[in-house]
A protein has these predicted regions:
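Alpha-helix initiation and N-capping motif
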Residues: 47, 134, 138, 150-151, ...
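Short linear motifs in intrinsically disordered
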Residues: 149, 155-162, 194-197, 224, ...
Length: 516
């Protein structure tokens, strides 16, 4: 496959309302063909997603979308000596309007990540009677999962997908050790997945990134390509970063990528886990409401700026008013006649309907994103059931996310299982290990409640002590906690038996004729 074919990617789209309910009509008894209805879309890029993530890039800060106000001022025309000539001129000037952008997108991103990644990935042996060898291999696997920071890898991947709509996890071997990295548009990586049209599996993957000079100019553009066997690195110089060969090829119109490295990646399969969200980032369905809220709030701020302060009103006859101001133009004193009056027009308050609009927009931002704005608690801790109901929208969204990320997690586990197996010499043991793994949504529940529920379940015989030890692992215990419990129990049994033997020796009656 040529490099120009590799660097192809399906764009993200926003559906337009063109053609909605405009397909003609027919009689109920008349059979008609279904009309062709094409959906018109606006193309959006991952750069747009980053603009949405950072408040400085929001549309409310764009004067072409939310324009400033242009005003006209009448000024007297003065002569060379500064005297009024009686003529006037007009000056057009731009008055900047207040602009307020809020980081709702970051709030949504953080809350989604907490409920998706708040609990570690759950692992469990999928066999009724696990042997000691399987338990030892399972403990080694889970220890390596934590040693290699695979929980961090999953978090970084989820953060990338929920903010820029795609992500990739890549494993690689170097000098017999397993390493990994996450690829994201946030870090300057553009990802190009290519799938098998029959199986739907990833058959080729590419990553494009650039090197820049101190002045911010692009010097070199790199293209890394993975297939089932090899890793390819292509180079294309830009500007001053071009080599002599690239400059000569450019003269003849042959500029392009040059293969600089090709080597086996060491995996028997494509060591890339890729995920793409076709809807876009996690705040996509709230984006229009966020933009409307920011413009509405900015308009209210502009109204407060114009009418928020009391307005002084002078009621006098003639020109008997003398106003003294300081250097900043603030009125310090007013001199008037005995019959003149001064008063203030009180500032206008925002109407109830306008505040209702802002409040509704604010609530819909949270509702459309399935996040919860925690209310103020009047008294102590809430029970676990009440907390789950309170955070039910976020919990429901996390449940669907866990299902959607399961395929990505499967690929991550496969890459880690082989790569870390090569490092510790347990490739075959990990491959034969019969276990299952899944994501568990996080909900804000007091840890003491979880411990009490597990203790009650063990006491009533609902679950075993070993299962309870595995469930409580992320709180207080370790990967091999059940082995420690069994070892302590055996040591206690040995100590009790030794004590009983010593007591028996002390209490055993002696036979005085035995020595003779």
């Amino acid at each position: 496959m040529k490099t120009r074919d590799i660097k192809t990617k399906k764009p993200w789209r926003k559906v337009r309302p063109d053609g909605y309910n405009s397909h003609g009509s027919s009689m109920l008894s008349q059979l008609t063909d279904t009309p062709f209805d094409s959906i018109n879309c606006d193309i959006v890029t991952q750069s747009d997603f980053i603009r949405e993530l950072y408040p400085s890039g929001h549309s409310v800060n764009d004067p072409t979308i939310y324009p400033d106000i242009f005003r006209e001022e009448v000024l007297p025309v003065l002569d060379d000596k500064g005297n009024d000539t009686g003529r006037t001129t007009k000056r057009l000037y731009r008055e900047p309007v207040p602009r307020y952008a809020f980081a709702f997108q970051r709030m949504i991103l953080v809350k989604h990540l907490v409920h998706l990644c708040g609990n570690d990935v759950q692992f469990e042996l999928n066999s009724n009677k696990a042997t000691d060898e399987e338990i030892e291999m399972f403990t080694k696997f889970r220890t390596g999962w934590l040693d290699k920071d695979m929980e961090v890898a999953f978090y970084e991947s989820a953060r990338s997908c929920k903010s820029t709509a795609d992500t990739a996890f890549v494993g690689f071997l170097k000098d017999g050790e397993f390493y990994w990295k996450t690829l994201s548009f946030l870090n300057g990586d553009t990802l190009y997945p290519h799938y098998d049209t029959v199986t739907g599996r990833l058959k080729l993957f590419a990553r494009s990134f650039s090197d820049y000079s101190e002045q911010g100019d692009e010097m070199v553009q790199w293209l890394e390509v993975w297939d089932e066997r090899n890793l390819y690195r292509y180079r294309q110089g830009k500007g001053d970063g071009r080599t002599v060969k690239e400059k000569l090829l450019g003269i003849f119109g042959l500029s392009g990528y040059t293969l600089v490295e090709q080597r086996p990646h060491g995996f028997p399969f494509l060591p890339v886990a890729y995920r793409r969200d076709e809807d876009g980032p996690c705040w996509t369905f709230s984006q229009d409401t966020i933009e409307g809220y920011e413009i509405s709030f900015s308009q209210m701020a502009h109204n407060n700026q114009a009418y928020g302060e009391p307005i002084m009103v002078l009621m006098a006859e003639g020109e008997n008013v003398d106003v003294m101001k300081d250097m900043n133009g603030t009125i310090k004193s007013v001199s008037m006649g005995p019959d003149d009056k001064i008063d203030y027009l009180q500032s206008q308050s925002a109407s109830e309907s306008y505040m209702k609009q802002l409040d509704t927009q604010y609530k819909m931002i949270f509702s459309q994103s399935f996040i919860v704005d925690p209310p103020e608690l009047k008294s102590g801790d809430l029970p676990a059931a009440a907390l789950k109901i309170l955070y039910s929208p976020a919990y429901e969204k996390a449940m669907t996310d866990c299902k959607e990320y399961q395929t990505f997690l499967n690929d991550m586990v496969a890459i880690f299982s082989f790569g870390y197996g090569v490092e510790v010499g347990s490739t075959l043991g990990f491959a034969n290990l019969n276990m299952k793994w899944w994501l568990e949504p996080y909900v804000h529940v007091n840890s003491s409640t979880v411990i009490a529920d597990l203790a009650s379940a063990v006491q009533n015989g609902f679950i075993s002590r070993q299962t309870a030890s595995e469930r409580i692992e992320t709180l207080y215990s370790t990967n091999s906690e059940w082995d420690r419990i069994m070892r302590e129990a055996k040591q206690q049994q040995e100590a009790d038996l030794l004590y009983q033997l010593r007591v028996a020796e002390v209490n055993e009656p002696t036979n005085p004729t035995a020595d003779k």
